[in-house]
Amino acid sequence: MCMPMFGYGVYQTAPEETERCVSEALGIGYRLIDTAQVYGNEAGVGSAVNKSGIDRSDIFIASKIWVSNMNYERATASIDESLNALNVDYIDLMLLHQAMGDYPGAYRAMEDAYKEGKIHAIGVSNFYPERLIDVCALAEVPPAVNQVETHPFHQQHAAPDVMNKLGVAHEAWAPFAEGLNGIFANLILAEIGAKYGKTVGQVILRALLQQDVIVIPKTTHRERMRENIDVFDFTLTDEDMAVFATLDDPAFKPIFDHLDVDTVSGLLNVFVGKQLNGEKLY
């Protein structure tokens, strides 16, 4: 799999805004576009891609199977639905969005879609190390990517060790921590950036890239798109990277804590309960 290290994410981008945003991102030079079934904006992504005039083989589209489709039959159907929504012949990378429900069954559906040429690579998202080991042990086609929350305050120092051993690429969601903890005003990051004439956001993205982490920052503003991708003309020193590492905060509560019972059960009730004759799972 040849996947760009830098991409554009459309999480929480309104469907009516998605085509414009993706078109602008493609025009600026982005070639990896990350969407998901639950985002409700696959159609906008596909429309922008198909109208771009860029050869389809030069654009890398990633989407994700949502928890309500986590068994073989529903996952199989949902892959076809995503292909139709995107209006493309294949999806470059399909991920399981969460390690919930019958994800082994959904994974088998992705493997079959891979063999049929509907998807060109398989991955997972939000799989903690023990779940990643589990799915790799069961997989006929190993996952290429694990997309997990990764940012200065939650740097995932342990997870990459497992990913590296399994040959799974590390992709970050929420590289800017969704703006929490005053991240864009962080004095440590600002001081690093000042040495290179770069912003806090650019320092974050550059640091992650230097750790071989794929990044997919989201913005709906053209100038911020340009700013985000302008990170290939400088390199952080070992000292900079050591300072960046000190920002990792064990006390930081993950944006979405997959080990929190109330969080997980609430998500399943909201997004899956309606799919199961209205009966709540918890």
Residue positions per predicted region:
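CE4/NodB-like, metal-dependent polysaccharide N-deacetylase domain
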Residues: 1, 75-95, 112-116
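N-terminal binding-site loop/beta-alpha segment at the start of enzyme catalytic domains
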Residues: 1-59, 176, 272, 277-282
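Acidic-and-aromatic substrate-binding clefts and catalytic sites of carbohydrate-active enzymes
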Residues: 13-16, 35-44, 68-73, 99-104, ...
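Short, acidic/polar
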Residues: 13-26, 70-86, 105, 130-133, ...
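Acidic (Asp/Glu)-rich catalytic clusters
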Residues: 26, 46-58, 80-87, 112-114, ...
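A structural motif
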Residues: 30, 88-91, 119, 143
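A short, structured active-site edge motif that brings together acidic residues
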Residues: 56-69, 92-99, 126-129
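Beta/alpha (TIM)-barrel catalytic core signal, keyed to glycine-rich beta->alpha loops juxtaposed to Asp/Glu
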Residues: 98-282
